[in-house]
């Protein structure tokens, strides 16, 4: 796919920000990074009122490991007033960005990766876990994340904290390993009682990642409003 096919089309010609605050936030969160943003998914509603994007911030590789590589963006236009508002969130995993958009009524068929972009799931376990994250992201907020670049593999670790205080094993560690030779990625989940236990396992890794206990994995929460991102570069 030519690089031009990844260019996000914001469709804001003839529109003005709905307020000074919207103008400042759009400039600081989106416009100043526009040259570094590649669209992995974008969808515009037929009535022209809404647009949805999953954007890859290519400049994140030069930042801190905690910088979020993906930006989920929802633009809402008022054609009568010729103004727009927006929401955006920096997120570490594609499935979490999908979840954020789906809960803002983006069609599920519109959040798949653009052909030729990104990597493919390495196995059925990865596919199932990504589907669960898309559908039930409101179980957790993001406590921390980091991404490490390298070759032939790259790794992203995300620590999630359960939003239900009574939830068993409230901390979940997501570990995504990308193989740049095969252009595939593997995603695994570990369940922990505390954040310290999750981070200790991540540092040591001498034992298998602890799986969620059956009682926790059988819970079927309502669909999310999208995961809450960890602190990092503001989006």
What are these regions (language model features)?
Residues 139-198:
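Intrinsically disordered, low-complexity segments enriched in Gly and acidic/Ser/Thr residues
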Residues 41-44, 59, 133, 137, ...:
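Generic low-complexity, intrinsically disordered sequence content enriched
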Residues 49-50, 56-127:
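Internal, hydrophobic cores of structured domains that mediate oligomerization or house catalytic pockets
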Residues 58-84, 160-186, 215:
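Short aromatic-glycine-(Arg/Gly/Cys) micro-motifs in beta-strand/loop hairpins
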Residues 223-235:
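Long, low-complexity, intrinsically disordered segments
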Residues 50-58, 155-161, 216-218:
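Short, mixed-charge low-complexity intrinsically disordered segments
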Residues 1-49, 103-159:
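Negatively charged, low-complexity tracts enriched in Asp/Glu with abundant Ser/Thr
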Residues 84-116, 183-225:
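Ampiphathic alpha-helical segments that act as solvent-exposed interaction surfaces
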